[in-house]
UniProtKB/Swiss-Prot annotation:
Entry protein name: Taste receptor type 2 member 60
Subcellular location per the Swiss-Prot or TrEMBL entry: Membrane
Function summary: Receptor that may play a role in the perception of bitterness and is gustducin-linked. May play a role in sensing the chemical composition of the gastrointestinal content. The activity of this receptor may stimulate alpha gustducin, mediate PLC-beta-2 activation and lead to the gating of TRPM5.
SUPFAM superfamilies, per database record: Family A G protein-coupled receptor-like
Gene coding for it: TAS2R60
Length: 318
């Protein structure tokens, strides 16, 4: 899902790679449609009613950032496919990279704040800090949203500075993308500036996300065991609700993990972009990205209500 993974100067002609690229495009379309529906459904309700649950506001933020991110990645994929010999730091690709850096950071931070909200509101820990956070967290929602924009903007500017300096070096020295000197300048900047910056900016929200998810899954697991001991089994509504919540959280965590690993692998060059394994890995990640919005649609009460109303309106029932 990394927008920087395309290596220019070569066109993909292998049949297997073309098939996987086609699958990737289809999965991206599914992810775009799913996140677009989530954003539109909750966003319209937010605008019309002027009220929305804090959790749903975070879902709007996450859905919008994912929708825009997938659209930018698809646009870059199409551009690179149509212009395989394009200069890597031309204005078009710099503009797409600028958008990708911002939306990628916004997606990471939106996911992180959503995990924080889930952890504080759902976890059943009895520590006084948790009780204090439960009462304060909803009031901090605007700051969460603004911090996502602020942190994303700050890191995007830092990435843009590095990319723009490489672009200026190429122009100043009249270098070509495939020139040895140009490659050494690019690798030096990647190794000592961009790669450390990527690891810092990506690891910070990921660490918070993991801590919150571990706490939340542990709390729900303990609560489920207690519910099983005091009820007749898995058919009890309370037990089923906890199982559904666990499955939704696990799918959310799996998507976030795969997304983070794709960023790290791409930045470290573990899977070369023209390698077949790279496209297989990307297909698995986008499969998770396409499935997760569907899980959200059926696990969120408001989204389920929107789906039911759409079905009833199509069937002509009141």
């Amino acid at each position: 899902m990394n927008g920087d993974h395309m290596v220019l100067g070569s066109s993909v002609t292998d049949k297997k790679a073309i098939i996987l690229v086609t699958i990737l495009l289809l999965l991206r379309l599914v992810a775009i449609a799913g996140n677009g529906f989530i954003t539109a459904a909750l966003g319209v309700e937010w605008v019309l009613r002027r009220m929305l649950l804090p959790c749903d506001k975070l879902l709007v933020s996450l859905g919008a950032s994912r929708f825009c991110l997938q659209s930018v990645v698809m646009g870059k994929t199409i551009y690179v496919f149509l212009h395989p010999m394009a200069f890597p730091y031309n204005p078009v690709l710099q503009f797409l990279a600028f958008q990708w850096d911002f939306l990628n950071a916004a997606t990471l931070w939106s996911s992180t704040w959503l995990s924080v909200f889930y952890c504080v509101k759902i976890a059943t820990f009895t520590h006084p800090v948790f009780f204090w956070l439960k009462h304060k967290l909803s009031g901090w929602l605007p700051w969460m949203l603004f911090s996502s924009v602020g942190l994303s903007s700050f890191t995007t500017i830092l990435f843009f500075i590095g990319n723009h300096r490489m672009y200026q070096n190429y122009l100043r020295n009249h270098l070509q993308p495939w020139n040895v000197t140009g490659d050494s300048i690019r690798s030096y900047c990647e190794k000592f500036y961009l790669f450390p910056l990527k690891m810092i900016t990506w690891t910070m929200p990921t660490a918070v996300f993991f801590i919150c998810m571990i706490l939340l899954i542990t709390s729900l697991g303990r609560h489920r065991k207690k519910a099983l001991l005091t009820t007749s089994g898995f058919r009890e509504p309370s037990v089923q609700a906890h199982i559904k919540a666990l499955l939704a959280l696990l799918s959310f965590a799996m998507l976030f993990i795969s997304y983070f690993l794709s960023l790290v692998f791409s930045a470290a060059g573990i899977f070369p972009p023209l390698d077949f394994k790279f496209w297989v890995w990307e297909s698995v990640i986008y499969l998770c990205a396409a499935v997760h919005p569907i899980i959200l649609l059926f696990s969120n009460c408001r989204l389920r209500a929107v789906l039911k109303s759409r079905r009833s309106s199509r069937c002509g029932t009141p």
